[in-house]
Amino acid sequence: MKRSEINKALKELEAMCQKHCCYLPPFCHFTPEMWQEIGHEYDEVRDCMLGWDITDYGMGDFDKFGFSLITIRNGNRAMADKYPKVYAEKLLYLKEGQYAPNHFHWFKTEDIINQIGRASCRERV
């Protein structure tokens, strides 16, 4: 994906969160310069890969295949003594007409909770 597409997707997700009073953790608003300055108090964000993720699944058509998400909580199997969570908390945003391919995690539990919008789960063949 082009950086301009990623930036646009981030802005759309931020706008959706703001519109629906969904408050994001402070680290979602850090600039690259801020990340250079913060210390070990944010190691969990780095170690557990919390934050933004924008994907088109390598298909090159974000408006059709892909979504935007923010990982708020996550475990880390490589550091299970420090981060033992076996679940993740993520905010996912799919635009009208977007699809996400089926997938699963061997060692992660996910519950899908629709908080905003409508549920539209279907399998594409």
Language model region names:
Residues 1-87:
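A short, N-terminal "cap"/entry segment at the start of jelly-roll beta-barrel domains
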Residues 77-88, 99-115:
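A short beta-loop-beta micro-motif enriched in histidine and acidic residues
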Residues 92-95:
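Structural recognition of beta-strand segments within beta-rich domains
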Residues 116-125:
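Residue-level detector of conserved catalytic or cofactor/ligand-binding positions
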